[in-house]
């Protein structure tokens, strides 16, 4: 090894000499770079990985474009300034620039050749300015542009030829202007456009030629205009379109076969319009549609076979309409639908086979109608339903076979109705049910066989009814019950044997009833109960409550005097307190005193 040293030493000296610059100047320290001078008052940064120069001039209160922007700049931020005018050839030396942000800069005028020299530009932001007009060929010098944002300006029209040269454009946003009409051929120079946003304008109609050249378009947003109707062949060339937004217009009619040719469409939003009727061929040709939103219209009825071609539809929104009835086979052909919303209609009559064919529906919203009585076996064939919403639907009674066939149901919402009677074993086939909500009804009695079959039920809400008593075996089938709310009823007694079968109970509320006494005999250690709420009853603080007094003092976590809570995600609101007072009503000597604050002497004779 030592024999190699004489050879390596001259080589090292030779390399060291070669590294000295001419004239004997010392070498640059590691980390020195040739950063171009940054224009005042901007900030510049050089990406260590790509060596791309970024120039940041945002919100500098500039009235003129900064001078001497380095010619190798790749990105230039000029947003939030006060330019007013963009002169011709303003960026003529920035041929390397690929990103230019001029949004929110008070721009009112852009001269025709303002973007001359920007041959490498990919992204241009001109949104949120005061632009009313752009001359034809304004973007002729930016032929590599991929995205162009012109939204939130004051355009009332767009000149034909404005987009000449933008054959590579993928994204164009003209939303939230004041556009009243568009030239027939305004988009004919954009053969590669993928996303077009025209939302929030004042367009009253669409011409047949308007979208003919946009054969690559995947997303079209026309929401928030004043469109009155959809004619045939408007979208016929958009065979690759996947999402179409027509919501928040004034559409009152759709021509038959209006969506023919749109074989790739997956999402169609027609909500918040004025549609009254749908026809058998309204949605003809939409073979790939997954989501159809028709909520908040004025639809009064649904004809059979209206949706027959939508074999891949997964979500159908029909809420907030005026539908009065559902006839047999209304939803035939919708074998893949998972979510069906019919809430906030005027439904009074649902035929027994109305839901036939909905083999995969998992969530069904029928709330806020006036159904009153559902026919027997109405949900026959809807075997995969997980959640059924029937709250606020004027229902007065539940029949024995109303929910027959719903073997997969997990959640059943029946709150805020007028239910006064439920036939025995009405829930007997709901073996997978986890949550049953019956609060805010008119139940005064629970049959001993009412909950037969609900062996997996975990949550039962019975608050705000008119219950006077509960018989011994009523809750016996509910072996897995976790949460039981019986608050705001008229219960005068609660026998130990009613609660004792509930061996998994964690939460029990009997607040605001008429209980005078309460036995904790069912709470033999080790018990599972974590919270017991008994406030708002007519407690007679005598020997019959000594057990409750001792338990509440021994287990204050189970019977807290209050619980503090804060609205989730909002730290600014004051905390809310839920109190669990055990206020004595009798005898007079203890009236007004909390049971837990009474002395041992009060119960010495027990």
What are these regions, as identified by a protein language model?
Residues 64-68, 88-92, 110-116, 136-140, ...:
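Recurring C-terminal helix/loop segment of individual leucine-rich repeat
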Residues 60, 81, 102-105, 126-129, ...:
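Consensus "Asn ladder" position of solenoid repeat domains
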Residues 296, 311, 320, 330, ...:
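Eukaryotic tandem repeat interaction scaffolds
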Residues 49, 63, 69-72, 84, 92-97, 108, 116-121, 132, ...:
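Leucine-rich repeat
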Residues 1-2, 8-40, 44, 48-51, ...:
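Membrane-proximal C-terminal cap and juxtamembrane stalk of leucine-rich repeat ectodomains
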Residues 49-99, 103-106:
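LRR N-terminal entry segment and analogous cap-like coil->beta motifs
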